[in-house]
Amino acid sequence: MNRAHLLYRDVLDIPADQWLEQHVYLSREVSPNAPGNLSLTGQPWAREILRTIASPYTREVELVMGAQTGKTTILLLAWLLFARFHPQPCLIGLSTDPLADRLAKRRLIPLIQANPAWGDKLPPANQGQESMILYPGQYTF
């Protein structure tokens, strides 16, 4: 298998949580309570989770967390890390189509739109795949 593409892949050279705080902007639509540059000071437990997820040695992460503790935000930030440093097809599955649709429209798409540099890491929309959903910004999920 040709692995030459690995030479040009971005490398995460600082802890994942610090990198995210430096490079992710949260719009008011994504984070109504704390818009602006990402800050994990209010969720210190998220730091270790994101560092673990970003580790090349991690194969699986299981979280047991209470309500309103940032699970969705952690999931979206992990997705951004993978899109940036390990680009490959990714499937985010939820229990129902309306729930998945709402997550994409209310959280994921606004997060991508607030951070234009991430858009170049996503494949362009493929109009030929009827099973895929085309969202604003020409991203296919």
Kindly give the residue locations of the regions a language model identified.
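Phosphate/NTP-binding elements of NTP-utilizing enzymes
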Residues: 1-141
